[in-house]
């Protein structure tokens, strides 16, 4: 089984923000593969099903970003998945421009509080991360305001393509392994 957790904040006011792009990918996968997110557990909205023959648990932690590790840690411990190969975290990344995707199999939190929480709760940093570029804050701007803001109307078609490509990247990770998916998606610049 794969646990696929998209990071975000649960309040409706955060829908469509840069920080919630992980939730958006989970919604996309749920819709594409007919996996209802109608269950709750592990402090998350959940959906269980299959993606091209692979059993998955889709998660949208409802803990707020900074406590995401509570939800992810509970699910990993319950299902006893191998966090190095069967846990996929989908996150926003301010160090990548919109249209860029990067897959990592380990590393620091890079200033991302949701990832920091997951590392703390798992007791290690070796898990697959699918990082989606949301762009850095404007010069002189506040980082929190930036990640909690929506994308510009001009950028929305690009973000829809990024979400579709992120869904394909998740499938590639499950079918071909993280290394092969990294070779395919890292460095790819998505455009409309």
Predicted regions: what they are:
Residues 2-105, 116-130, 137-142, 149, ...:
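Nucleotide and nucleotide-moiety/phosphate-recognizing core
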